[in-house]
């Protein structure tokens, strides 16, 4: 009697390439032959090709942070306007657990960044830790700090494109804080800005010199596109004197929602420098919400919501480079949705079906207890999809598109 493990290699590859990524780890432990097969370049190429084909036709995968745990989700928006059963359009495929630790459920993830099938995860601990992870292969690399990691550090994962087409993966760490944050009596306040780069090739950190006339906010997540990371940034504004902060400002002297020059910035991992300021297709005020996303890892999308939630819309780039950007017409203005936080509002754009999937909390603003995905379309179309209970009011669901990768770390 023929066993499934005795199938010809080509047929076994065809069968196993259709298995969800979350089950590949279990398959590798099933038999030595399958463990070897799933690590072959031909199998990985077939698996990645199938993932990309599904993404173009109807379904794509996403990595989502739900309640500080990582999950693999499938998103299928094909024919969504005709089907009121929107709950079936977003499904949880499984929890990602291959962090090569004794008890992966004890690893609490506060931030996650995606690049080329790799994830950079930051743990939520008193002393944060960094780990680069390939969920497909199960490989991990825990990154030791040069000094120590801080709660408000900003990170990015990207790669340097070399002449031989080999990609050299790197981490950018940006510390922007006041040395005396714990002692409010200190005057003047000493601000520290420091940039470090970690190379996965050399397994080492180095400090780079960057002169900034702009601010990156910890809550505004960067998006990596073609190996480079883009952020929403604002012109640097000097802090007011301490006594000015604590005294009452005369009525009418303070503006309710001021406009500060805002733009995009790109960090080029090949030359290890920031590019020039890139224009936005709108002029935001301080209390407005801006979040970024990628479209099939080829275009940049930006979501803008006015502070009074009277208007929300998305633009998509038709050209994006470290020193140049041009924007296509507005994708569409959305219907009235709940106020978004800078720490939330991750989203996907489906250009073909003219739909957006926006991840946030439930409709209750004062006591949001449910993680929710909103499927938003033209002419005011909006449908919520419940993603389960939220264990913490300020723990938002965060998502990024995902295609398996054979990258070795």
From Swiss-Prot:
SMART domains: FBOX. Residues 1-47 form the F-box domain. Gene3D superfamilies: 1.20.1280.50. PANTHER family: BNACNNG10540D PROTEIN (PTHR31672), F-BOX PROTEIN CPR30-LIKE (PTHR31672:SF13). NCBIfam families: F_box_assoc_1 (TIGR01640). This is F-box protein At3g17320. It comes from Arabidopsis thaliana (Mouse-ear cress). The lineage of its organism: Eukaryota, Viridiplantae, Streptophyta, Embryophyta, Tracheophyta.
């Amino acid at each position: 009697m023929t066993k499934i493990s005795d199938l010809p290699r080509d047929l076994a590859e065809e069968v196993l390439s259709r298995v969800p990524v979350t089950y590949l780890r279990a398959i590798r432990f099933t038999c030595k032959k399958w463990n070897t097969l799933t690590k072959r370049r031909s199998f990985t190429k077939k698996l990645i090709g199938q993932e990309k084909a599904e993404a173009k036709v109807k379904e794509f995968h996403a990595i989502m942070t739900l309640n500080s745990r990582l999950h693999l989700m499938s998103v299928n928006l094909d024919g969504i306007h005709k089907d009121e059963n929107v709950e079936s359009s977003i499904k949880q495929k499984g929890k990602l657990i291959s962090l090569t630790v004794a008890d992966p459920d004890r690893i609490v993830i506060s931030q996650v960044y995606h690049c080329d099938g790799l994830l950079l995860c930051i743990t939520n601990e008193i002393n944060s830790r960094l780990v680069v992870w390939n969920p497909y292969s199960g490989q991990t690399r825990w990154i030791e700090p040069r000094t120590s990691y801080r709660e408000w550090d900003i990170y990015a994962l990207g790669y340097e494109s070399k002449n031989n087409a080999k990609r050299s993966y790197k981490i950018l760490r940006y510390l922007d804080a006041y040395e005396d944050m714990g002692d409010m009596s200190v005057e003047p306040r000493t601000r520290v800005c420091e940039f470090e780069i970690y190379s996965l090739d050399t397994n080492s950190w180095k400090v780079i010199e960057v002169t900034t006339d702009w601010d990156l906010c910890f809550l505004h997540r960067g998006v990596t596109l073609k190996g480079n990371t883009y952020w929403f940034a604002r012109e640097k504004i000097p802090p007011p004197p301490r006594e000015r902060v604590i005294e009452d400002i005369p009525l009418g002297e303070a503006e309710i929602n001021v406009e500060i020059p805002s733009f995009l910035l790109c960090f080029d991992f090949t030359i290890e420098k920031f590019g020039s300021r890139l224009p936005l297709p709108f002029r935001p005020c301080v209390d407005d919400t801006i979040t970024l996303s990628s479209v099939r890892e080829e275009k940049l999308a930006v979501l803008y919501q006015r502070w009074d939630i009277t208007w929300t819309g998305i633009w998509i780039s038709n050209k994006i480079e470290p020193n140049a950007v041009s924007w296509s017409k507005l994708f569409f203005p959305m219907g009235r949705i709940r106020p978004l936080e800078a720490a939330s509002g991750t989203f996907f754009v489906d250009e073909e079906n003219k739909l957006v999937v926006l991840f946030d909390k439930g409709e209750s603003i004062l006591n949001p207890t449910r993680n929710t995905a909103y499927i938003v379309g033209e002419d005011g179309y909006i449908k919520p999809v419940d993603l389960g209970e939220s264990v913490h009011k300020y723990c938002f669901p965060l998502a990024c598109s995902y295609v398996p990768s054979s990258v070795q770390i």
